[in-house]
Amino acid sequence: MTQRVRTRFAPSPTGFIHLGNIRSALYPWAFARKMKGDFILRIEDTDVERSTQEAVDVILEAMDWLGLDIDEGPFYQMQRMDRYREVIAQMVAQDLAYPCYMSTEELDALREAQRVRGEKPRYDGTWRPEPGKVLPTPPAGVQPVIRFKNPIGGSVVWDDAVKGRIEISNDELDDLVIARPDGTPTYNFCVVVDDMDMRITHVIRGDDHVNNTPRQINILRALGGTPPIYAHLPTVLNEQGEKMSKRHGAMSVTGYRDAGYLPEAVVNYLARLGWAHGDAEIFSREQFVEWFDLEHLGKSPAQYNPEKLAWLNNHYIKQADNARLAELVKPFIEALGGRVEGGPQLADVMALVKDRANTLQEVAQTALLFYRTEISVAPELAAQHLTDEVRPGIMALADKLGTLPEWKREAIGAAFKEVLGAHGWKMPKLAMPVRLLVAGQLQTPSIDAVLELFGREVVLRRLAG
């Protein structure tokens, strides 16, 4: 019977989650969905000083916004301390781990001496019990760390789904501290116990964890577990070619939401940021899940391209249902000082203004002309466009618009043509002053469409003003 696929996302809640971080959730989520398996969320919060509930909330909010639903969790490492201590005690009892009383000062001196000799700095096994070895006397009043007895000789080998075969000699690995003097377990140990207890079959994570992997595999095997399949993702770089980070100006995932990006655009963009399905650039979440595999994960760092994300967002804005778009854009309009109630139907406005916008913020900026609580015309624009020459044309247009049997864009456009023909004018001569009077600005979508949405009553009142 084939083992059920179980993947996990295991972030540390230290306050910030950017696109590179959330990609490490998207890929295991997609793989679990593709394989009809389980996706688990684990919060690695053992760094008590830096971990906050607010940061956890940001992670959950980002995942919810992107639609990365979980099957189990969130599990919190700080709530599993009893389990970790149980396993540590078991390992000491089975001679898989041992207490080490070497002080920090002694360890620093040891490493400095090794550096002077040109050796790799490492713990030398002073307190490691071996047959026939006499250990030093434990110093009074000193709480030891607990170290894992790393295998001596041989090597750790795994076939990484991204990087291929990796082999690390055990001679390169010293005996890892798995519990601090106060008894709290260390990161690499907790990860192993969690992955084993949660029956994780595939670990898809950033390649900054590659160096941890041989240590984790050795501990896992010592506990009788089977290592999962590892897939270490290359780094995501920012526009300058540096590792993406808050320090280098990366935006948080929820920052993209607040800037007016659609979740489907961000998911589509992230999917291609380190994975490919032929030349496909645009695909739905469902298509992504169907296509996703580990074989086509990229082996080189992926570089963030804001223009590409904006292009994708424009595509999804254009494709979006107008009623849904209206609901999303309304807060942006209100933040700009607009009042949607009493204005044209927002969904109808979306149909007119959405095509050229790269973000919901840009949609709102264009749509705002319909929802200003008051309009005013700058004196210099009035002097330029609302001239004595053009006023008779405006009055003639108002007369024709007032008698239209139907307030439709086509009829409004025909009224413009009649007045333009009678006066021998080009469209801008009449359209510009009408825009100023009705919308308070010179730049708008097509004037006949704008007037149709404003409605006859508003248009005639403003033309008369």
Swiss-Prot record:
GO terms for molecular function: ATP binding; glutamate-tRNA ligase activity; tRNA binding; zinc ion binding. It catalyses: tRNA(Glu) + L-glutamate + ATP = L-glutamyl-tRNA(Glu) + AMP + diphosphate. Residues 120-139 are annotated as: Disordered. It comes from the Bacteria. ATP binds at residue 246. Residues 120-131 have a biased composition (Basic and acidic residues). One of its GO terms (cellular component) is cytosol. A motif ('KMSKS' region) lies at residues 243-247. A motif ('HIGH' region) lies at residues 11-21. Its EC number is 6.1.1.17. Keywords: Aminoacyl-tRNA synthetase, ATP-binding, Cytoplasm, Ligase, Nucleotide-binding, Protein biosynthesis. InterPro entries: aa-tRNA-synth_I_cd-bd, aa-tRNA-synth_I_codon-bd_sub2, aa-tRNA-synth_I_CS, aa_tRNA-synth_I_cd-bd_sf, Glu-tRNA-ligase_bac/mito, Glu-tRNA-synth_I_codon-bd_sub1, Glu/Gln-tRNA-synth, Glu/Gln-tRNA-synth_Ib_cat-dom. HAMAP family: Glu_tRNA_synth_type1. NCBIfam families: gltX_bact (TIGR00464). This is Glutamate--tRNA ligase. It comes from Ralstonia nicotianae (strain ATCC BAA-1114 / GMI1000).
